[in-house]
Amino acid sequence: MEQPPSTSTGIGDVGQNEPITAVFLLNIDRHTGPLLAGWVESGNRIGAIVVPGFRRRPTSFSVGNVRRRLQRKRLLKRYLGNSEVRLIEFGKPYDWDALRRQLSGIDADVLISYAFPILLPQDVLAGFRKGGLNLHPALLPNYRGPHPVHRLVVDGQHAVHGGVTLHRMSAGYDEGDILAQVAFSEADWVSRQSLAHSTATAFSMLVSGAVPAYCRGAVSGMPQPAGEFIWAELEPAHMIVLPTMPIEHVARLWRLLGTVPGIYLSMAGGNVRLGFQIRRLGPPTGQAPIRRWARVEFDLADGRVVHWKYSRLLKRLAKVRGLLAPARVAEPHLEMRLFGRSE
């Protein structure tokens, strides 16, 4: 997959027939790989990809870091073919001056970010003609913050505020003008696989469609309304299963949060981490939870159930089960909504 040649765009909007050069600030994974491919396939250029630096920087040779770099190369090969892409590792402690120097030779129109944990300095964003854009996995202004997907599932609001927003980056967390959104339905949340597929599809739609429209002046965006909105930060209490919860809600918690970060049941002696449900026994009994070897039996709002207790063995079994009988992932029927379209 060849990238088009670089073209100087001048100040302001990008010309209709000129490719757009973007710097991406994101990890390369199953969510972001398709958007990178879609960006290049639509005739645009990748100036550089700024990827997270490794959490630990060993003083000697690290097999783990070599493995992670090889995995990153395989993903780039899978999604971008033989395209030459510049990778910049950027991690704590964040040296913004050093990053500016590395980006100074790239004539980029826009910065596109996903899941970067801190605010970018305004002078960094000012280095791009069209500033910085961020992909947020919820329908803003609802569920701003670092853990929107987790909180949407915990709060049972996934079918109401679930989706992806493309917004301008500003001096506040997730507060910039909204350029475009893709809403999810209940069907997009039936499994981790379906959510990942829908998210990747939405990312690709927004980056391939809304970003060029914004850079060429066809979309200006809409300011976010003022008001009090839920700050999406996951607390330990959000991972506790309560007897007032319906069985289906707990099943969804397990499907989407069970392996990371986990869900727990409070029992005498401490919290027990839950695995997936084995069976439903019948209506609630009013009895306390019972621990039986690798299982735990407890009441929920609409029935008494038995779950496996979470363990390393269960984690492996769940992975094998997913490989042998993967969840069916239907092609999502998603629509993109643009804000502030020019006439």
What residue ranges belong to the model's regions?
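N-terminal Rossmann-like dinucleotide-binding module
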Residues: 2-70
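Structural motif
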Residues: 25-29, 92, 311
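Structural motif corresponding to alpha-helix initiation and N-cap regions
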Residues: 33, 73, 93-100, 146
